[in-house]
UniProtKB/Swiss-Prot annotation:
This is Probable endonuclease 4. Zn(2+) 3 binds at H182, D229, H231. The lineage of its organism: Bacteria, Pseudomonadati, Pseudomonadota, Gammaproteobacteria, Enterobacterales. Its EC number is 3.1.21.2. PANTHER family: APURINIC-APYRIMIDINIC ENDONUCLEASE (PTHR21445:SF0), ENDONUCLEASE IV ENDODEOXYRIBONUCLEASE IV (PTHR21445). Binds 3 Zn(2+) ions. HAMAP family: Nfo. Belongs to the AP endonuclease 2 family. It comes from Enterobacter sp. (strain 638). It catalyses: Endonucleolytic cleavage to 5'-phosphooligonucleotide end-products. Zn(2+) 1 binds at H69, H109, E145. Its cofactor is Zn(2+). Pfam families: AP_endonuc_2 (PF01261). InterPro entries: AP_endonuc_2, AP_endonuc_F2_Zn_BS, Xyl_isomerase-like_sf, Xyl_isomerase-like_TIM-brl. It is an enzyme of class 3 (hydrolase).
Length: 285
């Protein structure tokens, strides 16, 4: 079973995210549980929590179909201790919000060394940041997203993801989310079925599909291997349709939320319908 949707707005209340996802006939969705560009947010009230849970139940979104994303401000590998502590506090709050909402996944960008510490030291800080937060929460898996490798962001190599996982004590509560645009921009080719086979064989060898907890389905305005993060609508960018057809027809991607972060929300419903059709076509073949 494939779960496909988009990163929808929670403006006006978290429950609205589920409603908006249902309107585009999604079977998965992503959201921010707070303003992603602010450090602090008001605590969740019982009313907000209950309304969100009721909307998810009404529209048949189980916890495994929802991939919340944390704040863009958080850097779990920050080289400066004071800033690292601030990020760790905010990340814990994000996990606790998921816990309160009955959600089981939290997607996040791993972190950046800011040219001040080496990659290994930064990856170790990220793993320790995850350990600190997991020790104070229950039931929520920390889902590390691969990055395009812009600036000093880590996570653009599968080896980075594997190193972070290796440093996490509770392996049952850590996973990864693969963003197709980020992977392509980082030098993992997805432009044909053959290239997809190679890239995901490498992913299996280095990280392992057992850790795959979500996908971001995005085409790329950015060039292959450019280390530039620029999303595009499916089939309109430099990746093309084949990668998304491959993913929809491969059972290794079953049972996880796969969400669009493509550039035109007006065609999300069409993109979701197209993705679903690829799966149906394969099953009928």
């Amino acid at each position: 079973m494939k779960y496909v949707g988009a990163h929808v707005s929670a403006a006006g209340g978290l429950a609205n995210a589920a409603i908006r996802a249902a309107e585009i006939e999604a079977t998965a969705f992503a959201l921010f549980t707070k303003n992603q560009r602010q450090w602090r947010a008001a605590p969740l009230t019982p009313e907000i929590i209950n309304d969100f849970k009721a909307a998810c139940e009404k529209y048949n979104f189980g916890p495994g179909q929802i991939l919340p994303h944390d704040s863009y401000l958080i850097n779990l590998g920050h080289p400066v201790q004071e800033a690292l502590d601030k990020s760790r506090e905010a990340f814990l709050d994000e996990l606790q919000r998921c816990e309160q909402l009955g959600l089981t996944l939290l997607n996040f960008h791993p972190g950046s060394h800011l040219m001040q510490i080496d990659e290994d030291a930064c990856l170790a800080r990220i793993a320790e940041s995850i350990n600190i937060a997991l020790a104070q929460t229950e039931g929520v898996t920390a889902v590390i997203e691969n990055t395009a490798g812009q600036g000093s962001n880590l996570g653009f190599k599968f080896e980075h993801l594997a190193a972070i996982i290796d440093g996490v004590e509770d392996k049952t509560r850590v996973g990864v989310c693969i963003d197709t645009c980020h992977a392509f921009a980082a030098g993992y080719d997805l432009r044909s079925q053959e290239e997809c086979e190679k890239t995901f064989a490498e992913f299996e060898r280095i990280v392992g599909f057992k850790y795959l907890r979500g996908m971001h389905l995005n085409d790329a305005k950015s060039a292959f291997g450019s280390r530039v993060d620029r999303h595009h609508s499916l089939g309109e960018g430099n990746i093309g349709h084949d990668a998304f057809r491959f993913i929809m027809q491969d059972p290794r991607f079953d049972g996880i939320p796969m969400v669009l972060e493509t550039v035109n929300p007006d065609i999300w419903a069409e993109e979701i319908a197209w993705l679903k059709a690829q799966q149906t076509a394969e099953q009928a073949a």
